């Protein structure tokens, strides 16, 4: 039986593009693990995707995952089927332009084949303590690398 994991993720950017950070909180029962990272030149969307990638890569075995993000870009790409359309349509958008952040989307595609991931949208910068913690981790990653 697969372990059930709850993940919260967030990304931040100082300037867009600019210096970026991401943060994630992984919860398994009573155990919590926080991870974060930094990029010197990036976008907010790349940091949102990176948070999800790094969190899923931190899992040591295939798991059932509920992943919570305030990123409509991330959640909608999965829930509205954009990612499937992009991957089966030669990585172009409906307007025939190349999909942005293909490298990260391809990685997410690999990871959601390994793990059973359900994506959930949460409201950012509100009263969700876990999302707020991830926002703090992402912003601290930027601050610590100035």
Curated annotation (Swiss-Prot):
Gene Ontology annotations of biological process type: DNA replication, removal of RNA primer
One Gene Ontology cellular component annotation held by this UniProt entry: cytoplasm
Tree of life domain: Bacteria
Gene3D superfamilies cross-referenced by the UniProt entry: Ribonuclease H-like superfamily/Ribonuclease H
EC number, as in UniProt: 3.1.26.4
Cofactor requirement: Mg(2+)
Binding site for Mg(2+) 1: 10, 48, 70
Subcellular location: Cytoplasm
Cofactor binding remark: Binds 1 Mg(2+) ion per subunit. May bind a second metal ion at a regulatory site, or after substrate binding.
Entry's family note: Belongs to the RNase H family.
Entry-linked NCBIfam families: PRK00203.1
Summary of the function given for this chain in its UniProt record: Endonuclease that specifically degrades the RNA of RNA-DNA hybrids.
Protein name: Ribonuclease H
Organism in which the protein naturally occurs: Prosthecochloris aestuarii (strain DSM 271 / SK 413)
Designated gene of the protein: rnhA
């Amino acid at each position: 039986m697969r372990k059930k994991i709850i993940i919260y993720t967030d990304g931040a950017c100082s300037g867009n593009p600019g210096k970026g950070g991401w943060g994630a909180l992984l919860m398994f029962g009573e155990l919590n693990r926080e991870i974060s990272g930094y990029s010197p030149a990036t976008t907010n969307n790349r940091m949102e995707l990176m948070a999800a990638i790094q969190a899923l890569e931190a899992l040591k075995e295939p798991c059932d995952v509920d992943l919570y993000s305030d990123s409509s870009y991330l959640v909608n790409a999965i829930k509205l089927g954009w990612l499937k359309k992009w991957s089966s349509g030669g990585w172009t958008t409906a307007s025939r332009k190349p999909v942005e952040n293909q490298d990260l989307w391809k990685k997410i595609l690999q990871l959601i084949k390994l793990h059973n991931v359900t994506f959930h949208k949460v409201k950012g910068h509100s009263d969700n303590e876990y999302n707020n913690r991830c926002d703090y981790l992402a912003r601290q990653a930027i601050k610590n690398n100035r």
